[in-house]
Every structure is written in structure tokens, then in C-alpha cells.
Swiss-Prot record:
InterPro entries: 4pyrrol_synth_GluAld_NH2Trfase, Aminotrans_3, PyrdxlP-dep_Trfase, PyrdxlP-dep_Trfase_major, PyrdxlP-dep_Trfase_small. This is Glutamate-1-semialdehyde 2,1-aminomutase 1. It catalyses: (S)-4-amino-5-oxopentanoate = 5-aminolevulinate. One of its GO terms (molecular function) is transaminase activity. It comes from the Archaea. Belongs to the class-III pyridoxal-phosphate-dependent aminotransferase family. HemL subfamily. The keyword Membrane does not apply. Its main location: cytoplasm. Its EC number is 5.4.3.8.
């Protein structure tokens, strides 16, 4: 059965036919049948070079050999124990090695679960309730952060989700990203935490202005606020040590997900020992999950980190060169066509905004021409390239993309930009 038939069947048993809002686009999304390396194949037999990459999770590509072998071996040993394992200990040690700020780590299942735990932990540690987040930053689908969020909520125009109690939403102060004056005005000694995507990856790609992250660190330390880096996207993606290594700023608490698991669901929340010790059973901040430390996902994460650490000396420079060349090619082609555009890129993640003004925050991202982006997205699909169907997401490269893949992607963008004109 092809994608159209599958979607009609899905709508009868799945809300709107999809299990995550941003996966939908009219009239129906393609349904995946298989994926390998840098490409994905749909139920109709079409093959696409995959620049969605699991929304950035597949740094090593689909079906990386080391990950597949580790998962296959673990499936034979067991899939769920609900008691500690040696592999959990080794994974926490590896994470601490790559992220020295994560002196102690609790494994969870998703990035949203990690940020929920991080915020609860910060509130318990500081005995304060209020948090600061940034307009357009997305930190998962839970109440404290579904206020002026990015990702699918921005794409659908849902500023604050229904079902979030007003009292809870009032505990979240939302300010513009990259606005130092706004942060200085909001920071106070009644704030438990400041949570931020060090590079916004759920409002397109928006890098921090020079000195912005250092200001967050400085004022957080001065006022006793816990600085939370949500590295769900940037972790392992910008470097083996994430954004905190790339920008030289250490948070109090870090969340990791996506690339951590190499395509399997796993996340982590970690920080200074004196903070993490507040988690139950040693402390009174409660967090628990049946599938936390799931041995199959842990085996995938171990294989992913070990592979990344082994090849990082050539992996990140290669991805940087490839992404820089692709972004430059897209910019040149757009200029030749007379299109207003901004190509925002950090390391191997990027986004095309159809606008003449620099995109530095959620407001400027929302002023970009979303209808033109949609035309480009559909033309890319037609020409065999899959990117996320929203300008408020990102495109990314993986270790599996070949020179030929990137040549084809560049040509597809050239054609798609023409269609968007």
C-alpha cells in the first residue's frame, strides 16, 4: 500500500494520521518503508537523500554498522531488566568524559522528559518556582515550556498549548532570544532556572550572538539561577562535547537526546553532583520511569558515543566543510534568482529563510516567507531530497552523506529555489 492509502487508514486510528504534529503536511506525508546510510525510501518506492535525519538525531546516518551490531547483540541478551546494568554505568562515564559539566547523569527516555526533570530539579534545588525561557525555543511537550514554543507549535501557530494551566504558564517568563537587555531585566533572585537551546534548532537555526551565552552564565551565577543547556539538538552535533564545548560556556544542568541514541529513544539529564544528588532516592526531587536505562537504547548510545569519539578528528571537520559548501551554494543560487534569503548555519545544521533581514530570534524567523519555504520543500521532495516540512525546523548532514549525495542535494536546491521564486 502506498503513502496515500496508508494515510487514509492512519486517519481512522491515529489523531490527524500522525504521531507528531510536524510530520504532517498537506495533502498527506510520505510513509517511510526503509532507510539506509544517508537516504530514506517511502512506501511508494521513491528514494530521498535525507536531510531531516530524524530531526538531527542521525548524526551517523541510518543503520550505522556499529550501532546495528550493538543493538542486535543486546536484543539477544535481553530487552528490559528494570534493575541497574554495567552498561548504564559505562554510558554515564562516557557522557561525563565528553561533557565535564555532567558530573552525574540520570538516564531518561526523551528530550522532553529530560528537560522536565531538569526544570523540576532546578526548582527543588533552589526552592524557587519561576523559570525563564526564550521565545521560540522548544524544550518538549510539557507544561512549563509549552509557552511560546518553537518546532511544530510555531509551525501550527499555537503560541501556548491548550491544557496548560494558567497558573503553571505564569511561572514561565518568556523573553526574546539573543536580547541581552531583556534577559538582564528578567533575571532575578526568585528565578529557579534559565533554560535555553544554546543554538536555536526549533525555530530554524539561530545561533547565539557573541557573548550572549556568557551573559546567561554570568547572571545565573550571580543570582543563584540554574543555567540549563537543552542540548537535545546540539549535543554531539556541534562537537563531541556539544555547544558547551563549542562556545566554551558550562551550564549547571545539561540535557542530551537525539544524537545520543544513534536513532533509538534515549536521553540524559546531568549536572553538578550537588544538584543531581537531589534526585530520589537520595534526595526528594522525584523522577522515575520503567524504561529509563533501557538496555537496548543504552547499547545504541554506547556504540554511538564510542564511534563519534573514535572518528571525531575527521568527522566534524568533514561535516563543517560539506555544510559550509552547501550553504554557500544555496546562497549563491538564491542570489542569482533574485530571492531575498538568509542561510543560517552552525556546524552541520542549517536553514533557509526567505527574508532580507537577519534572522536572530523568533520574531524575525516568523517574518520570513513561510509560503515560499513550502514551495521549496515540495520541490525538494519532487527532486529527491527530504527536509523537515517547516521553516521552523532545520536541515542537517550526517556522516553517511557522500560527495555524490551532496552534489545531488545542491542541484535539487537549485531547482527548488527556482520553483519558490
Amino acid at each position: 500500500m502506498g503513502s496515500r492509502g496508508l494515510f487514509e487508514r492512519a486517519r481512522k486510528v491515529i489523531p490527524s494520521g500522525v504521531n507528531s504534529p510536524v510530520r504532517y503536511y498537506a495533502p498527506y506525508p510520505f510513509f517511510a518503508a526503509s532507510a539506509s546510510g544517508g537516504s530514506i525510501r517511502d512506501a511508494d518506492g521513491r528514494k530521498y537523500t535525507d536531510l531531516c535525519n530524524g530531526y538531527g538525531a542521525l548524526l551517523l546516518g541510518h543503520g550505522r554498522g556499529e550501532v546495528v551490531r550493538a543493538v542486535s547483540a543486546q536484543l539477544r541478551r535481553g530487552t528490559l531488566f528494570c534493575v541497574p546494568t554495567e552498561q548504564e554505568v559505562e554510558l554515564a562515564r562516557l557522557i561525563s568524559g565528553n561533557y565535564p559539566s555532567m558530573e552525574s547523569t540520570r538516564l531518561v527516555n526523551t528530550g522532553g522528559e529530560a528537560t522536565m526533570t531538569a526544570i523540576r530539579l532546578a526548582r527543588g534545588f533552589t526552592k524557587r518556582d519561576r523559570i525563564i525561557k526564550f521565545d521560540g525555543c522548544y524544550h518538549g511537550a510539557h507544561g512549563s515550556v509549552l509557552v511560546k514554543a518553537g518546532s511544530g507549535s510555531a509551525h501550527l501557530g499555537i503560541s501556548t498549548s491548550e491544557g496548560v494551566p494558567r497558573g503553571l504558564a505564569r511561572q514561565t517568563t518568556v523573553i526574546p532570544y539573543n536580547d541581552e537587555a531583556a534577559f538582564e531585566g528578567a533575571a532575578a533572585d526568585d528565578v529557579a532556572a534559565v533554560i535555553v537551546e544554546p543554538v536555536m534548532g526549533n525555530m530554524g537555526v539561530i545561533p547565539p550572538k557573541k557573548g550572549f551565552l556568557r551573559l546567561l552564565r554570568k547572571l545565573s551565577s550571580r543570582l543563584g539561577m540554574q543555567l540549563i543547556f537543552d542540548e537535545t539538538i546540539t549535543g554531539f552535533r556541534l562537537s563531541a562535547g556539544g555547544a558547551q564545548e563549542a562556545f566554551g560556556v558550562r551550564p549547571d544542568i545539561t540535557t542530551l537526546a537525539k544524537a545520543l541514541g544513534g536513532g533509538l529513544p534515549i536521553a540524559a539529564v546531568g549536572g553538578k553532583k550537588n544538584i543531581m544528588e537531589r534526585l530520589a532516592p537520595g534526595g526528594s526531587v522525584y523522577e522515575a520511569s520503567t524504561f529509563a536505562g533501557n538496555p537496548v537504547s543504552v547499547s545504541a548510545a554506547l556504540a554511538s558515543i564510542r564511534t563519534i569519539n573514535r572518528i571525531k578528528g575527521r568527522l566534524y571537520p568533514r561535516l563543517e566543510r560539506a555544510a559550509a559548501a552547501l550553504a554557500s551554494s544555496i546562497a549563491d543560487d538564491a542570489a542569482d534568482l533574485g530571492l531575498d534569503r538568509q542561510i543560517n548555519r552552525v556546524a552541520s545544521i542549517f536553514q533557509v529563510f526567505f527574508t532580507a533581514e537577519p534572522v536572530t530570534d523568533a520574531a524575525s524567523a516568523k517574518r520570513a516567507d513561510a509560503a515560499r519555504f513550502d514551495k521549496m520543500f515540495r520541490a525538494l521532495l519532487k527532486n529527491g531530497v527530504f527536509v523537515a516540512p517547516s521553516q521552523f525546523e532545520m536541515a542537517s548532514l550526517s556522516a553517511a552523506h557522500t560527495v555524490e549525495d551532496l552534489r545531488n542535494v545542491s542541484a535539487a536546491y537549485r531547482t527548488a529555489l527556482g520553483a519558490a521564486r
